[in-house]
Every structure is written in structure tokens, then in C-alpha cells.
Amino acid sequence: MAIVRQTLVYQGPGGPFEGVIAYEDEVTTLRPGVLVLPNVLGQKEADNVHAENLAKLGYVALAADVYGQGKRTRHGPEAGIYMAELNADRALLRDRLAASLDALKGFDRVDPARLAAIGFCFGGKCVLDMARAGLPILGGVSFHGVYDRPDYANADPIRAKLLVCHGWEDPIAPPEKTVALAQELT
């Protein structure tokens, strides 16, 4: 079997968006889908590699784009410009996450009833926001995420199973924010 990696352009608020989807070429049954959500730098090669690695495990994975086609950043002072726009409008972020999930769900090799999301830093925040918004993911993993709550009401109850991988001394999410997240999700 070979892993296929292809660009997937999809629509959403403020789009179009350009992600990369990866899957095994010989699989004929519908597979679980995993949305890979990027850090502050946005969709990039490292996310595509994560998608390929998930495809090797039998998933269909979409390295999502939440900033918009052609909006890419690099390390340095401008790195957070697009993230700051979405942090200021969490409802827009939620809607872009929903559009990314819809793109994954609509891919012809994905079982739309078996969806999950993983994310790194800002992407970890995105995973938590998907669960908070009640988007149809069965589970999510936040790696060193950002834990501040959005300004919209959480789904009640949050149905997605969540794994939060976090370093206690992380300056972006200090212990008191980690405790607040635990209280929120309990």
C-alpha cells in the first residue's frame, strides 16, 4: 500500500481554504477521519507529515487550513497575525473549524460517523473549541494547547472524549489555566 497525499481546497467563511489530505491508496472501506489542526504558523509541511503518519495507521487525515488559502506565516514578529484575528473572533474560528470538518467528512473515503481531531498549541485550542461547540467529533487530542474559553456557550454536555497532553510548567497555559480547564470539562 502507498500513502496518497493530495491538496484539498474547500470553502468556508473567509475562504477558500487549502489543506492536505492523506490516505492509503488500496483501502476500499470507509475509514475514520482525523482533522490535524496546526499551531500558530498555520498549515505547513509538519502538519502534512502528521496527516501522512495517521494515514499509515489506517485513518484518512486532513491537515486543515483555518487561516485561508495563501495565508501562511513564518517564525518572527508576524507569526501570530492570523491567529490573533481568530482569537478575537472565536465564533469565526468555530465556523472555520466546522468547514474543515465538513471537508473531511465529505471526502469519499471517510466514515462521517467516525471523526476525531488533534492539534498542537493553537491547534490544541481548536480541538477544545470543537468539543466545546458540539461539533461532531468522537474524540480529540490537544497537545500543549491554549485553554481560554470562547465567548459562546459550551455544548452541554461536551460529548467528545478529550485527551489533553500538557506540561505543567508551560508558560502559555500555566497551572491555574490547566486547573480551570479541568473544572470546565468536569
Predicted regions and their residues:
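N-terminal cap/leader regions of alpha/beta-hydrolase-fold enzymes
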Residues: 1-186
